[in-house]
């Protein structure tokens, strides 16, 4: 909106502009203005010319090696380089030198605590992936050991998680409907192998920035939708409905239809009583832990207590004889090798790769988000690329030892943090406890009711529905809220993979929208200063008579150059019409503030050439203010500076206004 000011106010603005311009003159004025009274103005600097090799090297290093990982190898002996290399691959060799009994005490307690949480969760999560319960325990034995040696997070707890288990189970069952077949198990190992390969390649190739394309808003919606889907899937276990009679679909309509269809002939009242009783118990313990952080352990051990008590109850009452579904047999012993089970050829190889890539990316996104959260809380650095290599290695090794896709668990990591863990040794302690469970305790889980495992899963995923985050998204960014809701409804009304696809699509759509439709703003001068700001943000900022100042707030590339040119011309037409209506001087100079423009390509240069020619026809002079080093170098290389005129490129907007603005005497 044009600033309507009286002649006296305009004179004051112009006088302030000239008195406050602290820069120095760099060339003659334009339009016949007398600029001999102006002081010298600094020219816009041009960076030293770089060779093509130097430009490529700089761009490559900034993209893939911004943290300069090889800097510490410089000027070191061969043995020292080997030592540093091993420490880089296995961080435990670096921080392990300073490990002491005090740290071990904290890690030992934390490891025991998360083990009590992970064992019942592992049994339950394996069922989400349509696998036998012992594969969950296998996965919590091998993967944490590998991560402890290669990971950089001190707090993350590794193992199967609900969302990835559900995603894996859904995608695998789309390929092989008979989840009890041996090929289904082999495909699970194959997907795990390629999930690990995907994660490792991202880390080795330094492509970790790719996972940032999935926005936080989309993740919030996807996780919430997945949590509800997981909860709905547990109704069959909670109500005692047979797997053979329950729908294989995951959308809310199909699940609820299946639930109500079996209300008279499928529900088992004893199962419902057991399931609801322990679900209420688990939710109460979570509430207690949330209200009093010192009692976090109450929530951590409640799943194990639920398993022990319910197993004993079913055993002494023989409730399994009256329709209460139980776990039955669980294999004991250490993980058997599965290297010869992976599909490296054949008709299921392509399916294994597809499922593995998707599951690997989702698992990696969740792990990195968790790792960054706790790293920020404890103020230490998390190396994203090392994390990817560690995650990839543990899933590759896991696929060869009867494990399915594992990642960082938020609930277990939170307990690990609250229990006082100091290093990744807590994962080793947890792994040893799981090993002892596999060797000694697994036969005792025979009478564990499936309803309790369903209750454990429901209680675990409740926190994934983050209402507060959704409300905050609505308040801050409506587009982010749409992305969140799109992913959420895609999961609960269609399927997990459709919800994930919607989340990715909306995230990319937002990026494309921001790139192709960047923000521009009309600037005005703040009273009493030489500062120019957005007139919508600062209504008192006064526009300069006869001048239009526009700021472009993004890089100018082929994807947005035409839009920026047309938007600037629309600003010119709209502002010109308003000023004519207000009987203000016509616009004679268009100043483009380019401070926020980090780069420009050939399409952007061409757009400015067209803009210049259009403005010439309208008898409006184009002026550029403060182009950055990359931009000014390209302007010189394209000879656009010669077309516009060296005297029309300024260090600041204030310099441009002081040189080409109307004289106070004219008013």
UniProtKB/Swiss-Prot annotation:
The chain crosses the membrane at residues 106-126, 131-151, 156-176, 185-205, 208-228, 269-289, 296-316, 350-370, 425-445, 452-472, 486-506. Its main location: membrane. One of its GO terms (molecular function) is secondary active sulfate transmembrane transporter activity. It is a multi-pass membrane protein. It is found in: Membrane. The keyword Transport applies. Residues 537-660 form the STAS domain. GO terms for cellular component: membrane. Pfam families: STAS, Sulfate_transp. Residues 16-38 are annotated as: Disordered. It comes from the Eukaryota. Keywords: Membrane, Transmembrane, Transmembrane helix, Transport. Belongs to the SLC26A/SulP transporter (TC 2.A.53) family. High-affinity H(+)/sulfate cotransporter that mediates the uptake of sulfate by plant roots from low concentrations of sulfate in the soil solution. This is High affinity sulfate transporter 1.
């Amino acid at each position: 909106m044009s600033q309507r000011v009286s002649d006296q106010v305009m004179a004051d603005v112009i006088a302030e502009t000239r008195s406050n311009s602290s820069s120095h003159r760099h060339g003659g004025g334009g339009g016949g203005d007398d600029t001999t009274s102006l002081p010298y103005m600094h020219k816009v600097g041009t960076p030293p010319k770089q060779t093509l090799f130097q430009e490529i090297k700089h761009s490559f290093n900034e993209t893939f090696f911004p943290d300069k990982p090889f800097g510490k190898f410089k000027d070191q002996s061969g043995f020292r380089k080997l030592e540093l290399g091993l420490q880089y691959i296995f961080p435990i060799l670096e921080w392990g030198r300073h490990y002491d009994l005090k740290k071990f005490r904290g890690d030992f307690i934390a490891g025991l605590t998360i083990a009590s949480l992970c064992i019942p969760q592992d049994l339950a999560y394996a069922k989400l992936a349509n696998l036998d319960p012992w594969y969950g325990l296998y996965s919590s034995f091998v993967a944490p050991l590998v991560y402890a040696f290669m990971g950089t997070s001190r707090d993350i707890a590794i193992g199967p998680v609900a969302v990835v288990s559900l995603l894996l189970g859904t995608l695998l069952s789309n390929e092989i409907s008979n989840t009890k077949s041996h090929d289904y198990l082999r495909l699970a190992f194959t997907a795990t192998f390629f999930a690990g390969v995907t994660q490792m390649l991202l880390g080795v190739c330094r492509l970790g920035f790719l996972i940032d394309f999935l926005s936080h808003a989309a993740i919030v919606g996807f996780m919430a939708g997945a949590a509800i889907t997981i909860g709905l899937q547990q109704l069959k276990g909670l109500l005692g409905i047979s797997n053979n009679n329950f729908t294989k679909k995951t959308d809310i309509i199909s699940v609820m239809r299946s639930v109500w269809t079996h209300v008279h002939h499928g529900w088992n009242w004893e199962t419902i009583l057991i399931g609801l009783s322990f679900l209420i118990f688990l939710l109460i313990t979570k509430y207690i832990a949330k209200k009093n952080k010192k009692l976090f352990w109450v929530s951590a051990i409640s799943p194990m207590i639920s398993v022990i008590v319910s197993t004993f109850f079913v055993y002494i009452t023989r409730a399994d004889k009256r329709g209460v579904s139980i776990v039955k047999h669980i294999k004991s012993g250490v993980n058997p090798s599965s290297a010869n089970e992976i599909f490296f050829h054949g008709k299921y190889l392509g399916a294994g790769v597809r499922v593995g890539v998707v599951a690997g990316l989702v698992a990696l996104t969740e792990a990195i988000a968790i790792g960054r959260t706790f790293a920020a809380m404890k103020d230490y650095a998390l190396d994203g690329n090392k994390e990817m290599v560690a995650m990839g290695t543990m899933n590759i090794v896991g696929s060869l030892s009867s494990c399915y896709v594992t990642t960082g668990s938020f609930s277990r990591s939170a307990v690990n943090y609250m229990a006082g863990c100091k290093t990744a040794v807590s994962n080793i302690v947890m792994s040893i406890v799981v090993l002892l469970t596999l060797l000694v305790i697994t036969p005792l889980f025979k009478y564990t009711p499936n309803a309790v495992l369903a209750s454990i899963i429901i209680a675990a995923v409740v926190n994934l529905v983050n209402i507060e985050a959704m409300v905050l998204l609505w308040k801050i960014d409506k587009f982010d809220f749409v992305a969140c809701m799109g992913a959420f409804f895609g999961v609960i009304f269609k399927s997990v993979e459709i919800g994930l696809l919607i989340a990715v699509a909306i995230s990319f759509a937002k990026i494309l929208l921001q790139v192709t439709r960047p923000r521009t703003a009309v600037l005005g001068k703040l009273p009493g200063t030489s500062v120019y700001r957005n007139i919508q943000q600062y209504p008192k900022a006064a526009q300069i008579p006869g001048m239009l100042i526009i700021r472009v707030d993004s890089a100018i590339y082929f994807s947005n150059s035409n839009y920026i040119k047309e938007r600037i011309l629309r600003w010119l037409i709209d502002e010109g019409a308003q000023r004519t209506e207000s009987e203000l001087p016509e616009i004679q100079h268009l100043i483009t503030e380019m401070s926020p423009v980090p780069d420009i390509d050939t399409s952007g240069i061409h757009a400015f050439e067209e803009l210049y020619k259009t403005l010439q026809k309208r008898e409006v002079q184009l002026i550029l203010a403060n182009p950055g080093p990359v931009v000014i170098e390209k302007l010189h290389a394209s000879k656009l500076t010669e077309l516009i005129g060296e005297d029309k490129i300024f260090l600041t907007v204030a310099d441009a206004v002081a040189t080409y603005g109307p004289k106070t005497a004219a008013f």
